[in-house]
Amino acid sequence: KNPDDHGISFLNGLGEVTESYTIGSLVEKSYQLSLYFQKFKPKGKRFLLLYNQGLDFVIAFLGVLFSRGIAVTAYPPRDKKHIPRINSIINDCDPVALLTSNNLSKKIDKWLDNQIGNDKPLIATNNLNLESSENWKRKSYSSQDIAFLQYTSGSTSDPKGVMISHAN
């Protein structure tokens, strides 16, 4: 595909485009983040993504996939009553890092710090100084490898992780 082709747009409540990005800009930022994740030796390791909807989530999700890690998606806690769900997910999936955006990181850090004795790094991915993507190399993977985990709501019991492979 052409890097200048349309990649993704975000709309406001009226259906008007508020942000739009090309495939090239999405891929470049995702590759850069993928290179950053190499310090975690990411192959098959889980990264918990705690983002609001938007570009930061898309780039982090793709960055984890490009690094051969496993993205674990969850809504960030809106208030203290949602902390037990996040704790349950963290305990179940044992992520190597918690990823979020700069505007959520302080709130999440405050909520989670005392809850689980969290020793996992909380990384605001849109606030990193990332290297150029020119050193990025495609990683091979099997279609049967797990791409991401999607957790159930946990409304009737602890959230359960559903494994989604690259083939799905």
Model-identified regions with their sequence ranges:
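Conserved pre-ATP/AMP-binding loop-to-beta segment of ANL
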Residues: P3-H6, I123-A124, S132-D158, M163, ...
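Short beta-strand elements of ligand-binding domains
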Residues: Y51, Y75, D119-L130
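A short helix-loop-beta submotif of the ANL/AMP-binding
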Residues: F47, G54-P77, S88, D92-A97
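AMP-binding/adenylate-forming
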Residues: I70-V72, N87-N102, A147-L149, M163-N168
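Internal alpha/beta domain cores that form substrate/cofactor-binding pockets in large enzymes
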Residues: I108-P121
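Conserved AMP-binding/adenylate-forming core of the ANL superfamily
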Residues: I8-V58, R78-N87, S133-S140, I164-A167
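Conserved ATP-dependent adenylate/AMP-binding module captured primarily in the ANL superfamily
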Residues: P76-W111, E131-S133
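A general structural motif
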Residues: P3-D5, K43-G44, P95, D119, ...
